[in-house]
Structures are given as C-alpha cells and as structure tokens.
Amino acid sequence: MEWKIERASVEGQRLAADIRLQAIVDGEAALPGSLRDAATVLGVQARAVPGAGETQGDKVVLSGQVLFDVLYAQGDLTRVQCIETACDFRQIADAPGVTPRMALAWDVCVEDAQARASGGRLMLTAALSLYAIVTADAAIEAVTDVTGDPALRTRCCRARLQRTTGRGEARALVREEFELPAALGVQDTLYATADARVDEVVGGEGRVTVSGTVELTVCHAGGESRPLVITRHSAPFEQSVALEAGEEDAVGASVRVLDVMADSMEAGEDARVLRTEVELLVRAQATHAAQRELLCDVYTTSGDLAEPARREERLMADGAGERARESGKIVLALPDDAPPVGTMLAAFVQPAAGTRERSGGRLRVDGMMGVTLVYLPIDSQVPVSTRQDAPMSVQFACGLSADAAIALECVEAVASAITSDRVEVRFILSLEGMDCGAQPLQVVTDVTRTPAQAEPGAIVVYYPAQDETAWDIAKRYRVDAQSLRALNPQLEEARAGEPVVVLRRGAAEA
C-alpha cells in the first residue's frame, strides 16, 4: 500500500542565542573644589541605560551608558554636594549562529557601584549584569500525519508556538511640578532618580496607548540640622505607540527611564517648587500564540518499517517579559568604628541577584544587598556614611522561571534608627525579567520505508528501562498498544524494572 505523508509549514520563532554577561565599567570625574580641600564621599547611586544593540555575524554588540550620582562633602563638611557624570560601555558577546538583522531584546542593570575621591578627582566603578535574547523567524516543513496503511501507528502531539508579529516604540517626556513644604528646609535640589511602570495598554487599528506611573526620588541639600533631604513624588504618563497587531494577538508594553532632570526654586514666602522632567522610552509588542498538531512518532505493526527523520528546533513557546515588586526590611548593626547615629538622613540600596528558585507560584531570589547609610552622628553637624553588604532573600509574585534573565533595582529605601548602633532599613525592590520560553522540539521532517527482516513470533517478558513508555515497548516489538494492554491489564504506564508481557507478531495465542 502507498503511504500518504501529510506535511504543513510551521511558522514560529527560533531561539538563536540566550546570552548572560557580567561587566565592569570604570570612569572618573573632576571635583570642582580646591585640591587642598579633602573630599568625603557620602554615597553613590548608578543606573544603566541601554543604548544600541546590534546582531552581527556570530556575535552581539551591546552599548549604553552608566549614569553616576555621587554625594560628597568638600571644604564645608556640613554641606552636602552632588556631582553627576556618565560613562559609556560597549560589550561584545560571542553568539555562534547569529546573523545580522535578527531580532534582539536585551537589558542591563547595575549590581554594584562605588566611588572614591583622590587628588581632586572621583574614581568611579560599576558592576553590570547584562542579558540578551536573539530570535529569528522560522518556517519549518513538518510532517503532521501518515496514512494509507492499516498497519501504521502514529502518535501526535500539540506544540505551542509563539512569535512576535509587531513591534513599536516611542519616546515620552513627562514634566511635573510639586510643592516643597517650608518645613522640609530644602535649600537646593541635588539630583533625582525615577522608576516607571506600565499600568494599562489599550487601543487597536495600528496604534496602542500605554499609560502608567513615574515614581521619583529626589535628593535635596538642606540646613545644618538636616543637610540631606529626601522627597518622593509620582506622576502619570500616557503615550501612543504605532503597532500593527492582529485580532488574536496579545499586546504588551514596557517602559524604560532614559533621563531625569530636577530643579527647585523659590515661589513666594517660605515656599519652594520642584520642577521635574523625565524622558521615557515606551515599547509595545504584539505576539501571536498558536497550537499546532504535529507528528511525534510512527511505526508499523507489519510490512515495511517506518523510519521518521527528525530535526531538533528550539522554538519560542511562552517567551514573555514580566515585572514585579516586593517589599522587605533588614536590620543592620553599625560597624564598631562607626559613630553612633543621631539623625538618619538617607539610605541607598543596591541589590545583586544570585541564586533563584521557583516555589508556590513565586520566584525566590537570593543574593547580596549593598546598603549605604547617611546620617548625622550624635552631637555633630557633619554627615557621615557607612556601607555594608547584607544577604537578601526576596520572593516575587510572578510567573518567571528560575532560569529567566532578570534585572533588580531598588525603587525606595527608608532607614530609621532603632538604637544608636542599630538601623532598620525598609525597601521596595523592582524585578524585571524575561523568559526566553524556548522549547526543544523534535520535528519530524520525513518518513521513509525500509524493508523489515523476518522475525519469529514469541511471547516475551520485557523489563522496561528508566523513562521507557508503553508506546516505546509497543514500537520496539511492533505490536498494537491495545494488545499490549490486553496482556497486561494493570498496565497504565511502564515502570522501570516491572515486567511487561508482549505477544510478538507471529506467535499464536494459546
């Protein structure tokens, strides 16, 4: 009998590379004060801004900037000053099989930042964690079924395939003003940081509207009793993005803070106004998910042998980005040589992710947390700082797997003195991650017929190996699965070491 092989073109996205990198960025900046005045670094915050990403022949090139905000005191040690500077980075990662114009998604975060003053200059260092996922559109000719002979036995499986059908991005500028009460004692605004999140994505017909919230943390210079003042503010944003999406496509969006500017000025008697400007990059993406019925395996119970030809493909199944937040707290004991706490001014937290484990619908992230405390000692108007590393373990409510690429940031940290040598730090961490969602799929590309050698009939007692299934046993001895279960009524699924009785073709039933 002639076999009829049914084929179909399967459209999906192939995972070309999943890259994880660590990098160190060094830089320096000149202090504006006199060389004769020693400078004391009180704290440093750094954030990484992704720039251009490019796929080339067997490699991926990632570039961007690290923005440093350094608090220091120089000359008048009771006065907190700030210097802002940027350092460029460029990383090249080997990626065999990658070609130009493949789709690239990547992100970067700062895991540690340090600053040291020497000879009128600041020496800056940042440790970066980068990840990149490269995909390519793939159209695969796959066998979906084989018919035409009653001796054929086929097993099909459902494959979930996901592919990106559209991308779009736009820049947004969020300007907002806030009142600063006179009770805060703000004299000047030093710098600001911002975190943005997406709250809603709506729209259609070629455009989507992305709305969300920008949260700002602003550092100000104050008076002698409180030389450093921290204020927090929030503002909404809304941005339209051009995006072509189908009716059955899922639409998602993400937002990245590119730049933050803040300044304050007097506005009448005992009043001050804070003016902020935040530049955002808003990205939208449409994805289409589909279930396809594909041939997984085939054999015959008589006649010619059926030999499936297979090819392994890593196709995207559930790849998606996700964002989550979680709060926590730690209690720190000051170092023995640190002066006792009088007035707590600020806390800066820099998380670094280590091991990850998924349990109970949550992703637990263990790692280290660099904590910088800025405070006024008892009976002193000169601010000091201490930096300590503390272990952390935070559980995020999200659907990311333990192998997902993640980036951690601290969006808020508040410190309060329990005693003169113990401080409680409450923090909120933001996790942004991406599951590549690739599944190794054995695609049957063809089925060939080969003559079968004559074999005598027999009754066989077979002991399955580990991970061997009833289908594997039936295929090995070219018997029907129903006859296998008829001889083994208790057989739900094969178990290693438990005997299975097989009536081989040609044996007569007693």
Feature roles, as predicted:
Residues R449-A486, L491-A510:
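Primarily a LysM-type cell-wall glycan-binding module
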Residues E2-P456:
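Membrane-lipid interaction segments
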